[in-house]
Amino acid sequence: MKTILAAYSGVKKGSGSSILSALHDLPTVPWLTRSKMVKHLQVISVLQFIMTFLTMGIACSLLLMYMFCTDFWVISVLYVAWLIYDWNTPGQGGRRSTWVRDWTVWKYMRDYFPIRLIKTHNLLPSRNYIFGYHPHGILCFGAFCNFGTEATGFTKVFPGIKPSLATLAGNFRLPMFREYLMCGGICPVNRNSIDYLLSSNGTGNAVVIVIGGAAESLDCAPGRNSVMLKKRKGFVKLALKQGADLVPVYSFGENEVYKQLIFEEGSWWRTIQRKLQKFLGFAPCLFHGCGLFFPESWGLVPYCKPITTVVGEPITVPKIEEPTQDVIDMYHAMYIRSLKSLFDNYKTRFGLNESDTLIIH
């Protein structure tokens, strides 16, 4: 047990040497081989990500309120004062931490699926970019691992480019969780935040937007290749106003890691899901993976399915301060064609058939 704890403490600290030294001792334990230990660390790393994003914000909020009623109330008061002072930081570039992005735990999470990043074209550090990420999936494993961490080596694959993954602005109102997100270079998905990154933060910025958003996650399931894009034109308008190039990104396998009960449009359950999604900001999906101890059972652990994120060819976009609707529609159509081409060119390499098509909703 001490060996297990020593290995995982190395994961959290980002110390590869402590992990290896702990693992070298594993052959002395007859029931735990090195390969099994690595697999356990991968599962723990994935669960750490899931539980952090599902519970950290709420748990820290409750803890802060509880501390107000204890002898530690001063800590709560000081943090709330800091929160008020620092309220606008997430929308002004945040506080990226190279140390957090380089944590070894993210590499174990990467290897669980595994997750890969594929470059098709070079990106110029003298330009700014908006990456359109598709599909949303249930928990956006590919988006977070590729753009919220250095597990797949984004800054080495695209030298001079700094990614900023955009997520719900409400997440940055939650104590401590906001600090955690900012360390990964994650920003609010609102106009002010994106405008700041593309206009007041120099060049070489890549804002990653999951275009389909929470609504798209309601249709994510194995074997489905569909994205919500037809009416999503706000990101194109942002790109035109800032002169940022558009880059389509498709993650093959993102929809394969969880199974979901999908209700038909117009049904009573789907109506409830849509209303809750608009009220809460995220979609209440009924999904499951495999169990922690018994793979054939249901649980939160995602299925081990490869996720391959392909970054497509950038579409050069001029800077137009007040783009007309016709211009927005034109570049939106160009983006859709580019995304379809990206999907068709790579689908057979990553588990799909030649007959599979990308459905645009």
UniProtKB/Swiss-Prot annotation:
It is found in: Endoplasmic reticulum membrane; Lipid droplet; Cytoplasm, Perinuclear region. It is a multi-pass membrane protein. It catalyses: an acyl-CoA + a 1,2-diacyl-sn-glycerol = a triacyl-sn-glycerol + CoA; all-trans-retinol + an acyl-CoA = an all-trans-retinyl ester + CoA; 2-(9Z-octadecenoyl)-glycerol + (9Z)-octadecenoyl-CoA = 1,2-di-(9Z-octadecenoyl)-sn-glycerol + CoA; 1,2-di-(9Z-octadecenoyl)-sn-glycerol + (9Z)-octadecenoyl-CoA = 1,2,3-tri-(9Z-octadecenoyl)-glycerol + CoA. GO terms for cellular component: endoplasmic reticulum membrane; lipid droplet; perinuclear endoplasmic reticulum membrane. The keyword Glycosyltransferase does not apply. Its EC number is 2.3.1.20, 2.3.1.76. Belongs to the diacylglycerol acyltransferase family. Essential acyltransferase that catalyzes the terminal and only committed step in triacylglycerol synthesis by using diacylglycerol and fatty acyl CoA as substrates. Required for synthesis and storage of intracellular triglycerides. Probably plays a central role in cytosolic lipid accumulation. This is Diacylglycerol O-acyltransferase 2.
